[in-house]
Amino acid sequence: MSTYSIPYYNQMNGNYNNGMPQQTTAANQQAFPQQQQPTTTGNASQQQQQAAATAAAVQQPYNYMFYQQQGQPGQQTGQTAGQQQQQQQQQQQYDYNTYNRYQYPAATSQGNYYQQTIPNQLSQPQPQHYNGSNRNYTSAPSGAPIPSNSTSGPSQQPPLPGQQAVPIPPHVSTMQQPTPVQDTLNASSTSTVGQFQPPGIRPRVTTTMWEDEKTLCYQVDANNVSVVRRADNNMINGTKLLNVAQMTRGRRDGILKSEKVRHVVKIGSMHLKGVWIPFERALAMAQREQIVDMLYPLFVRDIKRVIQTGVTPNAAAATAAAAATATSASAPPPPPPPVAAATTTAATAISKSSSGNGNSISATSGGSNVSGASGAGSTTSPVNTKAATAAGIPQGNYYQTYNQQQYPQQYGQYNAPGKNQNTPASQPGSTTNDQYLQQQQQQQQQMYGYQSNYYQGGAANSSYYPNYYQQQQPNYASSYPYQQQQQKQQQQQPNQQQQSDQQQTSTPSGGAGTRSVHQSPQVQSLTQGSVHPSPQQHQANQSASTVAKEEK
């Protein structure tokens, strides 16, 4: 035992309030225990009560040691065993009930704490990154520190607002909504999209059936590596994912071995073998390696919607809403039935025009841009057939934009009901159509931001038919008064078209290309001529004769 008396001991601890006259007797007894006789039981209990009252009033920081030093001289001076038990009971009651500065939880609460945290980690091997409320990928586990507040009985702090003070079963209190290990994609926790459409990239997904696992798979190719995502639990082949990042084998295997949730596949086709990891971890790795955009739309959460419509879900909703507002504000778009009719009769009309009219381009000219542009409804350009078939369906949002930007003014001139080419009323219709197209382009630039680079030539620059817009429209206007004379000339000279055919074949390829750019709209007029026969055929014949005159 130390030789310091109790008031000095308190002063050493920074507590100057205990120098009371009642305390000095206890101090004398403890400082000089040999000189005093054994005290009575009432005196000892008085001392203990006084010391407990003063300590509770002051709350000195080291009261546990203070009580032990007070208890030891009493034991040395011959107190009875009952007094020692009373002292120990008071020590226990005091330590855990009135001492609220450090808040040691009771033994039962510590047991509950470990019961709640440890089995949770055992029963749920899924790392805490994929858990409900954690968006960032490197956060601490969310469930661990909660039970100390919810179950420790003597602690003075109020429990958290979402929890009760009653002890709760472990699996309920730590995780309010435990996610199953099988489904590694939490649509409610993180962002609803997962990945937006990067500029300049169109979605390319292959859907395959994995027979062994009996699930669908979504396969995206990048850097000559096919990365696969399962449809049932959204796990992704991490081996192939890191191969896209061109990572070395050692680093790749080290990263995948450290994953807590992984599924190793050793049997099957090449793109299915490897270590499969959860969706969130794969997304984190892809973001770290900066390969997310290359793998679009693998990380779009609602990837089925992308496959059906061809656009990211919230982007599709935004484009549909913007298109609805634009159509209500400006002139109505061209009606879909003539477009569908043009697609059905496109091949026959082009074959007829290639045999009858020498100025048109044959449909067999393959994949060149000029022939693709010659028939807006021709079956050679896949984008237009999809757009024409999906014209009345809301899923056609993705492809309609390509149509209206590639062939804007032809649709305005030839498809507008009640407007012929040779009437001057086509010009105000084309201006309203220009406004509509500008709005469409602005929306496209807002949504995607890249199509202006690819399709600049719609209405603004007209790079597809530059000479047509500058020269051919004045030809229509100037040739209109002489229509009857030109018809007579055509009747007198039926062989002009054959001569123009021979001239075109004799001219070099560059000249033929420029003429084909001039004459490509006439093919369209002929395809539309299958719907509205009489005026467009006259117009095609007139324009053919004028071009033949120019060549002479």
Curated annotation (Swiss-Prot):
InterPro entries: EFG1/Phd1/StuA, HTH_APSES_sf, KilA/APSES_HTH, Tscrpt_reg_HTH_APSES-type. It comes from the Eukaryota. Residues 121-151, 419-434, 516-546 have a biased composition (Polar residues). Residues 238-259 bind DNA. One of its GO terms (cellular component) is nucleus. Residues 340-381, 435-447, 478-504 have a biased composition (Low complexity). It is found in: Nucleus. Residues 204-310 form the HTH APSES-type domain. Keywords: DNA-binding, Nucleus, Transcription, Transcription regulation. Residues 17-48, 70-93, 121-180, 327-384, 410-447, 478-552 are annotated as: Disordered. Its main location: nucleus. GO terms for molecular function: DNA-binding transcription factor activity; sequence-specific DNA binding. SMART domains: KilA-N. Pfam families: KilA-N. GO terms for biological process: positive regulation of transcription by RNA polymerase II. Belongs to the EFG1/PHD1/stuA family. Putative transcription factor that stimulates pseudohyphal morphogenesis. PANTHER family: PROTEIN SOK2-RELATED (PTHR47792:SF1). This is Enhanced filamentous growth protein. The gene is EFG1.
